[in-house]
Amino acid sequence: MAFPASLAALLLMAATQDLDPLVVDEKAGQVTFGAKTLKTDVHPQLKGAIEYLITMRGGKSYESCFETGPLDALKLYLGLQKIGAVPGKPAAEGKPAEGCKLRITVEWKDGDKVRKEPIESFVLDDTTQKPMEKVQWIFAGSKGGYIPEIDAEGLLVISTKNLMGLYQGDPTPLITNPTPLMTGNRYKVNKAILPKEGTPVKIIIEVAK
């Protein structure tokens, strides 16, 4: 059944609002929040290449796997610190990104079953033609600077809305890939495992041990 564009937009908005909110569970040592899977190959010229794994609405969703529901990036930044994650520094002047190492998992319902996979499983490494190897992600913490939206200094992720990056050349995501690549086309969506567009998922972040 086809819906008018306006109704389809309302249905999409309702689905976004139903996503899990940000939860900081200090006892369990977890930060969780809801997201949804994104449409792949929005721009064919990119040939499936992505630069991010998690974006907020208004971020570069056409180069990402997951988009969050309503989320305050600053609260996420502070929430990660509450579970013991210490922010470091984005890559700069030839030095790679630094910061606490994180383990990030994606959970979703597949029929009657609940599935859970490391977030890197959703990335295809074009150099090996295999899923990205398991890594511990870096809590770099985002570069600071002027944010037009609030007319003040702050974390630039608030403006870019790209939470988790695959290349260290973008210093604005809170979380980045430990592989010190600055830019490129190495990473693509692993379509073999990514659930269909719009599937609700839960992002689970823990300090790596």
Question: What role is predicted for each listed range?
Answer:
Residues 17-209:
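Long, low-hydrophobicity ectodomains and other hydrophilic envelope-associated domains
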